Amino acid sequence: MDAQPSLDDRELAVLAFEGRSFTSPGAKERAVREELDMAPVRYFQLLNALLDDPRALAAAPVTVNRLRRVREAKRQER
């Protein structure tokens, strides 16, 4: 039986990071650079991909479902 590999440390860190709150978008982007050592654009690309990954849903269901709802609401606004 082929088991899906688990999320790597960076993917888990992105999900954990997204559970935090920030005072402004600038503060969040600065924290992404400093704490995760990645560009904010890359962070959001990875986060968006994780929202469609069943492994991410299993690892952080509350966070993933909340972000899916936010993403869907933004899509419907367009």
Language-model segments: residues:
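Amphipathic, hydrophobic secondary-structure cores in small proteins
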Residues: 12-67, 71
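Long, intrinsically disordered, low-complexity Ser/Thr/Pro-rich regulatory/activation regions
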Residues: 70-78
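Short, Lys/Arg-enriched anionic-surface-contact patches
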Residues: 1-12
